[in-house]
Curated annotation (Swiss-Prot):
Catalytic activity: N(6)-[(R)-lipoyl]-L-lysyl-[glycine-cleavage complex H protein] + glycine + H(+) = N(6)-[(R)-S(8)-aminomethyldihydrolipoyl]-L-lysyl-[glycine-cleavage complex H protein] + CO2
Name of the molecule in the record: Glycine dehydrogenase (decarboxylating)
Cellular-component GO terms for this entry: cytosol; glycine cleavage complex
Top-level division of the source organism's lineage: Bacteria
Family: Belongs to the GcvP family.
Cofactor section: pyridoxal 5'-phosphate
Signal peptide region: none
Taxon lineage: Bacteria, Pseudomonadati, Pseudomonadota, Gammaproteobacteria, Enterobacterales
Sequence positions bearing N6-(pyridoxal phosphate)lysine: K708
Length: 957
C-alpha cells in the first residue's frame, strides 16, 4: 500500500528515538509477560477507576528539527541587553573547553548522584576540587559539595546556626539590611515555619538586639559596599552568637576570607565561576563552616577514604546527616544539589588557576575603579567609598539615565532610591565602560579610559587595606597544572572515564528514572537567548522565556490534572517544601493554622519526613500491610485520632514499593474527610503520564521531578527542577517573589528559591521532550516503562523473589528484588551484588530502599531489549555465582562477590583467589569493558578519618 504524505513526514519520529524497544521487541516482551498489548498490560495493572479514557491533550508530536525551530523562534523573543543589575548574578565567560567537554558531554551530565563511589571517582574528584576552592576562598575548615542557590544556602545557614547555638532560649535571627532582597525573602519564608523571629537592621546595630542566636552579614553588600566585619564578628562571638557571612567567589579572590575574621559559616553563589545567568539558574551555592560544626552542615560532603586495597579513594562522607537516613531528623531535606554546576565552577578554577583568577578579579576591579573615577570627576556621587565590582551612583534625573540605558540596550539596577546600581563582570570591556559613561553623563563627557586607568592604577583606595587578602589561594597542584587547553581536555577526560554514566550503560536505579536525555533536548540550554538573561531584567526582555514557561506550565497542568503550576522550586525536595507550605498557608487562611499533622507511610522516601519537618509539621507514620500497601485501617485510625490537627498526607504513586495501590482514591477520601489535604509525591510520575494523573486520582498538590519524568539530566547529582502542581484552592498559596512579580500567579507568599522561576534555563529540556513526544508518545513512554519493569521482574523472579506485586503478580514501573533470603542462606548481601554488577558493567540498582536488604530496579522506557537482557543475564550470572558460594566451591570470605569490584591492576598482581582473573574482571566478556578505578570503599574509615580537601597528586597515581 502506498504511504500517505503524513506517514512519510513521520512527525512522531522522535518517539521511536526516545523509547528503547521497537515494536517487534515490545511484542516479544509482551509475550514474555503474558500480555497481548501495551493497552492490555496497562489495563491489568492500573486500577480501573483511575485510568484516563484518553491521554491529556498536549498536542501532536513534532520532529526534533521542527521542535528546535519552534523553540528557537520563541527564544528569539528574548532581548539580550547587557545587564549590570548584579544582585548576585553576572555575565560570565564559560571556557569553551569546559562547555564542550563537560556541559555538552553526556559522560558528565547523565551520571547519577555518587552514592556508588566506585563508579564515581571522576566527578567526586571534581567536587573535592570545588570544596578546596571553597575552603581556600572562605578561610574555613569544612565545605560541602554545593547547595541549590545562594538564598537557599542562607536559609540553611540560619537553620544550622540554631542547631549549633548554645543559646538555646534565643529565638531571633538577625539579617543585615544590605543582603540581597531575594536572600532575605527566602530566609523569611524558612524562618516562619521554624518559628524564628527575623530582625532586619543595619549591621552596626546588631548588638542592640537581645535573644539573637545567629546573624547573617554580607561581605559585599547588595549595593556594593565592602564591609570589614572583623571587629563586629569578634564582639558577636564573645556573646556566643553564630555568625554567617554571605560572600562572592570572585570578590574573595582579592578580599580577606571571612573565616579568617572569625565567621562560623560562609556561603554564596559560585555562578560567576563560569556558569551562565540563565534567567536565574541553575547555579551552585558554596557553603563552608568551622570544623566543630561539621556534623550539623547541610548537603553532600565529599571525603577522602581508602578502598579495600588501601588506595586513596573518594566518597560522600557523613551520610548519616542526610534525609535518606535520618528522615525528619535530618539536617536538611536536600537530595538533589547542583553537582554539574559545582563541577563547572571547580574546573573553571582549575583552568584559570590562582594567577588567572587574580587577573580576572583585578581586571573587574580596575574597570570598576575607572568607572568610579570618571563619574566622580564629572560630579556624580557614589554612595560607598569601598567597593569591588559594584557602584551605587546617585543621579539627579534617574528617569533620563534609565531611558538612555534602555536606548543603549543596557540594564542598570533601578530599585535603589535616587540612585542606580552598576555591577561589572569578567565580560566587561573598556568599550563597555565608555558606553556607561555615555549613559550616565551624556555623550560629551570628554573622559579618556587610558588617562583614568593611569590615575587609578597609582592610587586605588576602593578596597580597604585591612580587607585585602594577604594569603595564597589555590596552592594545590591541581590548580596550577592544567592551563593549556590540551592539558585541560585530557584532565577532564581522565575524570570522565572513571565514571559510569548513561552514555555507557543502563543505570537501573529504582525511584530515580534514569532515562534518555536526548541531544535535541539539551541543545537549547546553551543558546545565548536563554543562557544570557538576568533573572531580574525587565519582563518585556524575557517574553520568550515567559512564552516557553507558560506553554510548559499549560502542558504540565493537563498532564497532572491540576489547575495551576508554580515553576519556582529548583529541586524535588524544594518542591515538596513549597507544596507543604501551600497547604499550611491554605489552612491558615481558614483560621486552621493549628493543623500541623502530616501523615506519611512507613515506605516513604526520606525527603518526605524531612520536608514536613522543615515546613513546621509533625510527622505521624502510617503503617503498610504485608503487601506493601498503605494500611487503610491504620490510616483511618490516625486520621480520626488527629482530625482536629490533620494537615495532610504525603503519598507516592505508584507507591515506593513499585505497585499501583488499588485503594489510592480511598486514601484521598479518608484524608479529605478529616479536613486534610493530599500531597502526592511526583517521584514516580513516569508511571502516570498519559495513563492517570494526580488530580484525577484526587490529590491536591504534587511536585514534579522534571529531572526524572521530563528528561532534565541528573548531572551527577543536580541540577533538578521540582515545580508544583496545585488545585485551584491552593493556587494563591504557592511561592511568590519579592523582586519579580510572577505573572499569572496571584500569590503573596514568600519565595523558596532565589530566582522567580528557579533554574529557568533547563526548562527548555522538558519543553522539548513534551513537544517531541506529544500526547500519544508520552502515554506510550509510560506504558513501555511499565513493560520493561515487568519484563525484568518476570525473568528474574525465579532467581530473586519480587517483594511486592499488584494484581496478577504485576509491578508498576519498577520492581523490588528481595535479597534477604539469599543473604540468610549464603551470607551474600545486596551490597555484594551491587558491587559485583560493576564488574559486569552496570551501575547498581537502588540498595535497601524502601526495604532493607533489597534491590529496587527501574529500567525506564529508554532502555532497549538488548540492554535489558544484558542486565538480566548479569543478574542471573551473579545468582549462579552465589550458588557457587552456597555449594562451597568458593568460600564466603573469598569469592568474586565479596571482593567486587575488581580493578585493572589486579590483572598483573599476585593472584591468590580461588577463582580466575577472567572470572573476576571479564564475567560478561571482554567487549567494551568498564574499568572501575578503585576497589570497594571503606566507609567506616572515611567517616572516622574525615578529610574533605584535595589530597596530594601522588595519591591519584
Amino acid at each position: 500500500m502506498t504511504q500517505t504524505l503524513s506517514q512519510l513526514e513521520n512527525r512522531g519520529a522522535f518517539i521511536e528515538r526516545h523509547i528503547g524497544p521497537d515494536a517487534a521487541q515490545q511484542q516479544e516482551m509482551l509475550n514474555a509477560v503474558g500480555a497481548e498489548s501495551l493497552n492490555a498490560l496497562t489495563g491489568q495493572i492500573v486500577p480501573k477507576d483511575i485510568q484516563l479514557a484518553t491521554p491529556p491533550q498536549v498536542g501532536e508530536a513534532a520532529t526534533e528539527y521542527a521542535a528546535l525551530a519552534e523553540l528557537k523562534a520563541i527564544a528569539g523573543r528574548n532581548k539580550r541587553f547587557t545587564s549590570y543589575i548584579g544582585m548576585g548574578y553576572t555575565a560570565v565567560q564559560l571556557p569553551p573547553v569546559i562547555l564542550r567537554n563537560m556541559l555538552e558531554n553526556p559522560g558528565w551530565y547523565t551520571a547519577y548522584t555518587p552514592y556508588q563511589p566506585e563508579v564515581s571517582q571522576g566527578r567526586l574528584e571534581a567536587l573535592l576540587n570545588f570544596q578546596q576552592v571553597t575552603l581556600d576562598l572562605t578561610g574555613l575548615d569544612m565545605a560541602s559539595a554545593s547547595l541549590l542557590d545562594e538564598a537557599t544556602a542562607a536559609a540553611e545557614a540560619m537553620a544550622m546556626a540554631k542547631r549549633v547555638s548554645k543559646l538555646k532560649n534565643a529565638n531571633r535571627f538577625f539579617v543585615a539590611a544590605d543582603v540581597h532582597p531575594q536572600t532575605l525573602d527566602v530566609v523569611r519564608t524558612r524562618a516562619k515555619t521554624f518559628g524564628f523571629d527575623v530582625i532586619v537592621d543595619d549591621a552596626d546595630k546588631v548588638l542592640d538586639h537581645q535573644d539573637v542566636f545567629g546573624v547573617l552579614l554580607q561581605q559585599v553588600g547588595t549595593t556594593g559596599e565592602i564591609h570589614d566585619y572583623g571587629t563586629l564578628i569578634s564582639e558577636l562571638k564573645a556573646r556566643k552568637v553564630i555568625v554567617s557571612v554571605a560572600a562572592d567567589f570572585m570578590a574573595l579572590v582579592l578580599l580577606t576570607a571571612p573565616g579568617k575574621q572569625g565567621a562560623d559559616i560562609v556561603f554564596g553563589s559560585a555562578q560567576r565561576f563560569g556558569v551562565p545567568m540563565g534567567y536565574g539558574g541553575p547555579h551552585a551555592a558554596f557553603f563552608a563552616a568551622k570544623d566543630e560544626f561539621k556534623r550539623s552542615m547541610p548537603g553532600r560532603i565529599i571525603g577522602v577514604s581508602k578502598d579495600a586495597a588501601g588506595n586513596t579513594a573518594l566518597r560522600m562522607a557523613m551520610q548519616t546527616r542526610e534525609q535518606h537516613i535520618r528522615r525528619e531528623k535530618a539536617n536538611s531535606n536536600i537530595c538533589t544539589s547542583q553537582v554539574l554546576l559545582a563541577n563547572i565552577a571547580s574546573l573553571y578554577a582549575v583552568y584559570h588557576g590562582p594567577v588567572g583568577l587574580k587577573r580576572i578579579a583585578n581586571r573587574i576591579h580596575r574597570l570598576t575603579d575607572i568607572l568610579a573615577a570618571g563619574l566622580q570627576q564629572k560630579g556624580l556621587k557614589l554612595r560607598h567609598a569601598h567597593y569591588f565590582d559594584t557602584l551605587c551612583v546617585e543621579v539627579a534625573d534617574k528617569a533620563a539615565v534609565l531611558a538612555r540605558a534602555e536606548a543603549a540596550e543596557i540594564n542598570l539596577r533601578s530599585d535603589i532610591h535616587n540612585a542606580v546600581g552598576i555591577t561589572l563582570d569578567e565580560t566587561t570591556t573598556r568599550e563597555n565602560v565608555a558606553q556607561l559613561f555615555n549613559v550616565l553623563l551624556g555623550d560629551s563627557h570628554g573622559l579618556n579610559i587610558e588617562t583614568l586607568d593611569k590615575d587609578v592604577a597609582l592610587d586605588s583606595r576602593s578596597i580597604q587595606q585591612g580587607m585585602l587578602r594577604d594569603d595564597a589561594i589555590l596552592t594545590h597542584p591541581v590548580f596550577n597544572r592544567y592551563h593549556s587547553e590540551t592539558e585541560m581536555m585530557r584532565y577532564m577526560h581522565s575524570l570522565e572515564r572513571k565514571d559510569l554514566a548513561l552514555n555507557q550503560a543502563m543505570i537501573p536505579l529504582g525511584s530515580c528514572t534514569m532515562k534518555l536525555n536526548a541531544a535535541a533536548e539539551m541543545i537549547p540550554i546553551t543558546w545565548p537567548e536563554f543562557a544570557e538573561l538576568h533573572p531580574f531584567c525587565p519582563p518585556e526582555q524575557a517574553e520568550g522565556y515567559h512564552q516557553m514557561i507558560s506553554q510548559l506550565s499549560d502542558w504540565l497542568v493537563k498532564l497532572t490534572g491540576y489547575d495551576a503550576v508554580c515553576m519556582q522550586p529548583n529541586s524535588g525536595a524544594q518542591g515538596e517544601y513549597a507544596g507543604l507550605l501551600a497547604i499550611r498557608h491554605y489552612h491558615g487562611s481558614r483560621n486552621e493554622g493549628h493543623r500541623d499533622i502530616c501523615l506519611i507511610p512507613a515506605s516513604a522516601h526520606g525527603t518526605n519526613p524531612a520536608s514536613a519537618h522543615m515546613a513546621g509539621m509533625q510527622v505521624v507514620v502510617v503503617a503498610c500491610d504485608k503487601n506493601g500497601n498503605i494500611d487503610l485501617d491504620d490510616l483511618r485510625a490516625k486520621a480520626e485520632q488527629h482530625a482536629a490537627n490533620l494537615s495532610c498526607i504525603m503519598v507516592t504513586y505508584p507507591s515506593t514499593h513499585g505497585v499501583y495501590e488499588e485503594t489510592i482514591r480511598e486514601v484521598c477520601e479518608v484524608v479529605h474527610q478529616f479536613g486534610g489535604q493530599v500531597y502526592l509525591d511526583g517521584a514516580n510520575m513516569n508511571a502516570q503520564v498519559g495513563i492517570t494523573s494526580p488530580g484525577f486520582i484526587g490529590a491536591d498538590v504534587s511536585h514534579l521531578n522534571l529531572h526524572k519524568t521530563f528528561c532534565i539530566p541528573h548531572g551527577g547529582g543536580g541540577p533538578g527542577m521540582g515545580p508544583i502542581g496545585v488545585k485551584a484552592h491552593l493556587a494563591p498559596f504557592v511561592p511568590g517573589h519579592s523582586v519579580v512579580q510572577i505573572e499569572g500567579m496571584l500569590t503573596r507568599q514568600g519565595a523558596v528559591s532565589a530566582a522567580p522561576f528557579g533554574s529557568a534555563s533547563i526548562l527548555p529540556i522538558s519543553w522539548m521532550y513534551i513537544r517531541m513526544m506529544g500526547a500519544e508518545g508520552l502515554k506510550q513512554a509510560s506504558q513501555v516503562a511499565i513493560l520493561n519493569a515487568n519484563y525484568i521482574a518476570s525473568r528474574l523472579k525465579d532467581a530473586y523473589p519480587v517483594l511486592y506485586t499488584g494484581r496478577d503478580g504485576r509491578v508498576a514501573h519498577e520492581c523490588i528484588l528481595d535479597i534477604r533470603p539469599l543473604k540468610e542462606e549464603t551470607g551474600i548481601s545486596e551490597l555484594d551484588i551491587a558491587k559485583r554488577l560493576i564488574d559486569y558493567g552496570f551501575h547498581a540498582p537502588t540498595m535497601s530502599f524502601p526495604v532493607a536488604g533489597t534491590l529496587m530496579v527501574e529500567p525506564t522506557e529508554s532502555e532497549g531489549k538488548a540492554e535489558l537482557d544484558r542486565f538480566i543475564d548479569a543478574m542471573l550470572a551473579i545468582r549462579a555465582e552465589i550458588d557457587q558460594v552456597k555449594a562451597g566451591v568458593w568460600p564466603l570470605e573469598d569469592n568474586p562477590l565479596v571482593n567486587a569490584p575488581h580493578i585493572q591492576s589486579e590483572l598483573v598482581a599476585e593472584w591468590a583467589h580461588p577463582y580466575s582473573r577472567e572470572v573476576a574482571v571479564f564475567p560478561a566478556g571482554v567487549a567494551d569493558k568498564y574499568w572501575p578505578t578503585v576497589k570497594r570503599l571503606d566507609d567506616v574509615y572515611g567517616d572516622r578519618n574525615l578529610f574533605c580537601s584535595c589530597v596530594p597528586i601522588s595519591d591519584y597515581q
